[in-house]
Amino acid sequence: MKRAILLLLHLGKSYTEEIAAAAAGLDLALVGLSSRPEEPTVLDGTRRHLADCVVTEEAELRSGDVEKALRELTDRGYRIEAVLASFEGYRLLMAEFNEKLGARDSTQAALRLCLDKFELRRYLFAEGLSEVRVNRLAPGAIPDLDPDTRWFVKPVRGASSFATFVLDDIGDLAELPAIQEQMRADRRMKAIFMDRYDFLVEEYVEGPEFSFETVVLDGRVHHLCVHEKARVERLERTTLEGMSVSPPASIDRELVLEGSDHVTRCLAALAGRGLTAGVFHIEVKYWESRKRWEIIEINPRMGGSLINPSTQTVTGYSLLDLWTESLLLPDGERDAFCDRLTRASQLEALRTGAPTRATVFLSKYGEKGRTIDEIRFEPPTRPPRILRLHVVEGTELDASDRGICLMDALWDVAADDLEAETAFLDRHAAEHFHVRYR
C-alpha cells in the first residue's frame, strides 16, 4: 500500500501542483477527490499532479463522497493517512476525516466557531478580547442601531468579500434578500456558505487592517508573516483588498508586535475549544480611536491571492508545505518543527530587530457581469516577479457582489523604504494595467 494524502478539490482546483510537491517531499502520494467542474477540461491539468483522482457528479463535496472515495482509493492500493482542503468550504470535511484518520488537526467544533463570524465575535467579546458590538440581522426586521456609531454589514459565513459594506443608510438592508439569492446561485462560492445565508451588523472598526499568516501545532502559535492591506477599495456592496505589503509600512514595530500578541491571546482562548492545529489567515484591525487591536476574521486556511508566495519570499517557507507536513508530523519531530518556524518568523525578526525581506503585491478587480475584450499588464520597467492573469479575452465575469480578481502581481521591495515603494507601485500599476470590456 502506498502512503497518501487525500486532497479535496472544488470544481477541479486546489493548489494541486504545490501540494503535490509538498507531498512528494514527504514521500507521500497525493490523490484527489473533486466535485465536478462545469468544464471537464479543467481536470486535465489537475490530474497531471495527482497519483489518482475520483470525481463526483455534483458541484459540491459531501461527507458521503469522502467516505466513498476513501474506500475506492484504498481498493486501488493507497493508504490514506490525512486529508487536506485549501478550499474553505471543505475545511470541516477535512477536520472530520482527519479525526477519523488520526492526523493532526483542529476539532470541527472549533473550526465551525471560527467560520461563524457572529458567534466568533460573541465568544471573543465574552472572553474580554473584543469590544465590538454585534447584532444578527433578522429577515425583514430593522435593527435598533446607535445612530452615532458607524456599522458594517457582512455575511455570517463569508467569502471573497461577498456583500461586505459600511452601512451608510439603514434602508440599504432592504437589498439583503437579493444578495442572498446571489449567494445561493453562485456555483463557485456556494459551498463556502455551508447553507448559511444570514447576515450580521457590527461596529465598524476604523483603522488600518492587517493579516497574520499563522501556523498552529499542538496549541503552539507561530506567526510566520504579517501583511498590511495598504490599499482598500470600497465599492457599492463589497470591500476589495487592492494592495498588501509585508512587513507593515504605516505602523511601527512595537505596534505590530502588540497586534501579534493580541492574536496569540485570542488563539489561546480558542485552544480550549479545540483550535490546536492548522494554518490560519487571521484578519485584524487596529482600532485607532480606542488604541486596541480587534480580530476581524479567523480564517482556518491559507490566505488567497499571493499571500503564500509573499510569505515564502519573506520567510523561506511555503504555508502549503508546512500545512502538509504538520498533518502527519511524528511526535518526536514537533520541537524541531516549531524551532524552524521560530527561526523563520518575520515577527520574531521584528521582535529582535533582525533584518527582514519585504514584498508588495497588488490585485486588480473587474466589473461584475462584464465581458473582457482585452487585458494586459506590461510595464516597461520594474516588472513584477510574479504575475498572474486570471482572465483572458472573452471571459464573462460573474454578475456577483463579490471580489472578481483579474490580476495579481508581486514585487520584491526594499524593506527600509516601504512607503515610497508602495506609492510608486500603486502609480506604476494604475498607469500600466489595462482592461477593456465589450
Question: Where are the language model's segments positioned?
Answer:
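Phosphate-binding site of ATP-dependent enzymes
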Residues: A178-L235, E254, H281, K285-E294, ...
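ATP-binding N-terminal substructure of ATP-dependent carboxylate-amine bond-forming enzymes
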Residues: M1-A109, L329-E333, A415-L418, A423-R438
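Conserved metal-phosphate-binding beta-hairpin within the catalytic cores
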Residues: T214, S250, L267-T311, A344-Q346, ...
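Conserved ATP-binding module of the ATP-grasp superfamily
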Residues: S130-V132, I170-E206, T239-G242, T264-R273
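ATP-dependent carboxylate/phosphate-activation module, predominantly the ATP-grasp catalytic core
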Residues: E203-E206, F210-A269, L275, N299-L328
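A short catalytic or substrate-binding loop motif that flags glycine-/basic-rich loops and adjacent residues
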Residues: R157-A159, Y204-G207, R273-G278, A354, ...
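A conserved helix-loop-beta module that forms one wall/lid of the active-site cleft
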Residues: E99-D168, A178-M189
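Peripheral (often C-terminal) accessory segments that flank ATP-dependent C-N-forming ligase machineries
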Residues: A126, P143, T324-R438
